[in-house]
C-alpha cells in the first residue's frame, strides 16, 4: 500500500510489519514491489536499504517494466540511494523493457542533480552516450531544466545545447515539448 510509505516509516516500523506477516518482497499486480513503493514514496534511505537486504529482494530484482531499484532511485533523484546501490554493484547500464538505463530514466524524468550523475559517470557510464533516438542526457533533461543548471553541468561533460539526436531534434525541440515558453 503506497499510503503506508507516505508516512516515512523507519526500519523498526517496517520490522514490526514484517513480524505481523507482511512480505517485504511482495509485488502488486503491476510488479511494483514493497521496495519500489518505498523508493517512489521517498521512505527513509535506511528503511530502503533494510528492505533491499530482505529475502526475495536484491539489487538485481526486476520490478515494473523490468526495472531494477537503481532505476527507481535515479527516477526519484535519490542520490544517496543511487550511490549505495552502485557501491553494492548495481548495474548502471541495465536496460528496462523499454531500453532505458537508470541515468537516462532520471534525465527523462527531470532529475538534474550533478552529484547523482557523477556517481553514474564514476561507475562507468559514458557521459556522451547516445540513448533512444540518439539523444544524450542533456537533450533528455532539457525539458525539465528550468534554470539550465543541468545543461550547464552536462556541457562540462562534453554535451552541448547544439547537440542533435538521430532524428535532427535539437535541445530547442526537446524543450518545446515541455510547453515551457520561457525555457
Question: What does each model-found stretch correspond to?
Answer:
Residues 1-5, 25-39, 60-72, 95-107, ...:
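Ankyrin-repeat boundary/"N-cap" motif
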Residues 110-183:
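Solenoidal tandem-repeat scaffolds enriched in leucines and small polar residues
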Residues 14, 31, 44-45:
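Short amphipathic alpha-helical segments that mediate assembly, nucleic-acid/protein binding
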Residues 15-23, 49-58, 83-91, 118-127, ...:
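Ankyrin repeat domain, specifically the short helix-to-loop turn at the C-terminus of the second helix
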Residues 5-9, 37-44, 72-78, 105-114, ...:
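Ankyrin repeat A-helix N-terminal signature
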Residues 64-108, 112-124:
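Long, mid-chain structured domain cores
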Residues 14-20, 36, 77, 81-92, ...:
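Generic detector of contiguous secondary-structure segments
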Residues 1-21:
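Sec-dependent signal peptide cleavage junction
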Amino acid at each position: 500500500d503506497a499510503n503506508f510509505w507516505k508516512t516515512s516509516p523507519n526500519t523498526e516500523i517496517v520490522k514490526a510489519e514484517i513480524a505481523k506477516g507482511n512480505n517485504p518482497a511482495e509485488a502488486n499486480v503491476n510488479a511494483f514491489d514493497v521496495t519500489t513503493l518505498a523508493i517512489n514514496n521517498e521512505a527513509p534511505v535506511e528503511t530502503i536499504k533494510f528492505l533491499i537486504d530482505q529475502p526475495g529482494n536484491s539489487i538485481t530484482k526486476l520490478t515494473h517494466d523490468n526495472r531494477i531499484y537503481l532505476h527507481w532511485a535515479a527516477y526519484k533523484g535519490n542520490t544517496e540511494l543511487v550511490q549505495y546501490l552502485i557501491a553494492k554493484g548495481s548495474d548502471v547500464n541495465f536496460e528496462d523493457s523499454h531500453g532505458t538505463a537508470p541515468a537516462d530514466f532520471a534525465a527523462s524524468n527531470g532529475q538534474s542533480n550533478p552529484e547523482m550523475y557523477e556517481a553514474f559517470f564514476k561507475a562507468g557510464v559514458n557521459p556522451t552516450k547516445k540513448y533512444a533516438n540518439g539523444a544524450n542526457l542533456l537533450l533528455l533533461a532539457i525539458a525539465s531544466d528550468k534554470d539550465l543548471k543541468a545543461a550547464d553541468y552536462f556541457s562540462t561533460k562534453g554535451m552541448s545545447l547544439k547537440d542533435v539526436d538521430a532524428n535532427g531534434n535539437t535541445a530547442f525541440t526537446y524543450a518545446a515539448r515541455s510547453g515551457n515558453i520561457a525555457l
